[in-house]
Curated annotation (Swiss-Prot):
PANTHER family: UPF0213 PROTEIN YHBQ. It comes from Limosilactobacillus reuteri (strain DSM 20016). CDD domains: GIY-YIG_UPF0213. This is UPF0213 protein Lreu_0682. Belongs to the UPF0213 family.
């Protein structure tokens, strides 16, 4: 039996903020955020449109939740460095 995969994902919001979450299905979870049914943070209209800018797969729920916790407790500068180190073009995001 194949074990379930878990993911963290990062959304870039229209107000220039980041939202990090945890899921076992990134596509479905992103859709819930886009339709204002996700986390309270992403239900705010001024944060839309949202862009899915990063996701990472984990073998265990514990590892994914730990990574989400770690990301959420970083400073803005540390989050930006993490995203840049993982190939996210923040300058391009801000221009669009």
């Amino acid at each position: 039996m194949a074990s379930e995969k878990y993911y963290i994902y990062v959304l870039y919001c229209a107000d220039n903020s980041f939202y990090c979450g945890f899921t076992n299905n990134v596509k479905r979870r992103f859709h819930t955020h886009q339709t204002y049914q996700g986390a309270k943070y992403t239900r705010v209209k001024k944060r839309h449109p949202l862009k899915l800018i990063y996701s990472e797969e984990f073998e265990s729920k514990h590892d994914a939740l730990s990574a989400e916790y770690y990301f959420k407790h970083q400073t803005r500068r540390q989050k930006e460095k993490f995203l840049l180190d993982h190939g996210v073009d923040l300058l391009k995001l801000r221009r669009n």
